[in-house]
From Swiss-Prot:
Subcellular location: Host membrane
Domain of life: Viruses
Knockout or disruption consequences: No effect on virus viability or replication in vitro.
Name assigned to this protein: Uncharacterized membrane protein X69R
Membrane-crossing segments per the record: 16-36
Segments on the Cytoplasmic side according to the record's topology features: 1-15
Family stated for the protein in its record: Belongs to the asfivirus X69R family.
Natural source organism: African swine fever virus (strain Badajoz 1971 Vero-adapted) (Ba71V)
Glycosylation sites (chain numbering): N51
Keywords: Glycoprotein, Host membrane, Membrane, Transmembrane, Transmembrane helix
GO cellular component, one term: membrane
Length: 69
């Protein structure tokens, strides 16, 4: 469901934003890919996915607190 919402928003933005703002289009393509990969994971893999993603974006180790029951 989340993937479809991101795809619809990306399509709307791509129609509204001119082509010279290619970075906005690239951002939504990356977001679609990340959401697609995230939805394929189970609950424990999702926890590790966000730890790895936040660590990669910030440049140092980040620990996301998660209560996985």
């Amino acid at each position: 469901m989340l993937l479809y919402i991101v795809i619809i928003v990306a399509c709307i933005i791509s129609k509204l934003v001119p082509n010279e703002y290619w970075a906005i289009h690239l951002f939504f393509i990356i977001m679609i890919f990340m959401v697609y990969m995230y939805e394929k994971l189970d609950i424990h893999q999702k926890y590790q996915f966000w730890n790895y993603t936040m660590s990669g974006l910030s440049g140092h180790n980040v620990q996301v607190i998660c209560k996985c029951y």
